[in-house]
């Protein structure tokens, strides 16, 4: 019906790792997620860090697991306390972030391509509002458990990643935005 039901500031991809425009269907919410480090980040950031400091993985709460590096769930996990998966070939998803100060900036292109959500708890509440098991209390527990928990959505939710430099607000006024790319 065109009514906005949720709004949040986001952080998107840097100019070197732009967030791509595409659509998908949100199928899962993952609380206290592991972060499986993508090969590009592993090669460009993690491996050089390991070469400089043999304790790099331990200092960043990371481990080798099944031939790849992953970051364990926790307070400083790069995905924060929850991620929202809509399977796609771009390996892009919505997620929380431990770096909260970026949401207050006018320009917020700081990620490797995923979309960091400024109000992840509120998004989880909205996405799971029709599932009686997922009360606000249970969402809070899952987000803070430190133990990964996958929740399959009963009804998939269409997600459209768009990029607009002009937008018409509820009053019919056109707002123009800086082109971050």
Pin down the residues of each PLM region.
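Well-ordered beta-sheet/strand-loop patches within structured domains
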Residues: 1-181
């Amino acid at each position: 019906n065109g009514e906005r039901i949720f709004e949040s500031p986001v952080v998107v991809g840097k100019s070197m790792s732009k967030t791509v425009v595409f659509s998908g269907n949100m199928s899962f919410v993952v609380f206290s997620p592991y972060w499986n480090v993508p090969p590009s980040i592993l090669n460009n950031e993690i491996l050089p860090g390991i070469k400089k400091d043999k304790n790099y993985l331990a200092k960043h709460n990371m481990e080798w697991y099944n031939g790849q590096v992953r970051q364990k769930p926790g307070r400083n996990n790069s995905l924060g306390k929850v991620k929202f998966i809509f399977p796609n070939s771009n390996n892009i998803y919505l997620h929380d972030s431990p770096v909260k100060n970026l949401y207050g900036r006018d320009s917020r292109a700081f990620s490797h391509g995923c979309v960091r959500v400024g109000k992840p708890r509120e998004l989880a509440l909205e996405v799971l509002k029709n599932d009686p098991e997922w009360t606000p209390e249970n969402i809070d527990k899952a987000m803070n458990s430190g133990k990964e928990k996958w929740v399959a959505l009963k009804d998939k939710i269409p997600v459209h990643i768009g990029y607009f430099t002009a937008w018409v607000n509820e009053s019919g006024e056109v707002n123009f935005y800086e082109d971050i790319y």
